[in-house]
UniProtKB/Swiss-Prot annotation:
Its main location: secreted. The modification Leucine amide is found at residue 8. It comes from Carcinus maenas. Belongs to the allatostatin family. One of its GO terms (cellular component) is extracellular region. One of its GO terms (biological process) is neuropeptide signaling pathway. May act as a neurotransmitter or neuromodulator. Keywords: Amidation, Neuropeptide, Secreted. It is found in: Secreted. This is Carcinustatin-18.
Length: 8
């Protein structure tokens, strides 16, 4: 859901 979760 954010850039740290790689699109999750």
């Amino acid at each position: 859901s954010d850039m740290y979760s790689f699109g999750l």
